[in-house]
């Protein structure tokens, strides 16, 4: 079933499953999804605004050119999203979200708050994290080349297990990287 150019607002769905539905150019506002299962679904060019999305199960799920603004994403394993996967997150809270083995080049994560998140074996080249906060969030074996981490807080990147060619980082994060490398900056 295809759903095109619909505005869906103020819904609370929990402990349910949606199968075989494709959304195109839809807007979701103030939607709450808890313990929801998406099977063989696709969202393309959709916007999610002020939504709460917790503990999703994703099977044969596609997310293409979607935007999340002012949303809470919690307990989501983004590794279950099929390729291609393109999205932007603006002013979102992410808790216990795993980005594993994904190709997310040129993704946008502006002014987001990451808590207990993991980026592992993920290609994030040329992604923009400007203004984001990181709390207990790890990057492991990921390509961060040409990423912009300007004005971020709490960023801690291990250069021994990540590719960090030409990245923009705040001074605090740069000092942490130098310390890991055994370089002491004094003055």
Curated annotation (Swiss-Prot):
Coiled coil: none annotated. Keywords: Antibiotic resistance, Plasmid. Disulfide bonds: none annotated. GO terms for biological process: response to antibiotic. InterPro entries: 5peptide_repeat, Pentapeptide-BTB/POZ_domain. Together with proteins McbE and McbF this protein causes immunity to the peptide antibiotic microcin B17 (MccB17), which inhibits DNA replication in Enterobacteriaceae by induction of the SOS repair system. McbG alone can provide some protection. PANTHER family: BTB_POZ DOMAIN-CONTAINING PROTEIN KCTD9. This is Protein McbG.
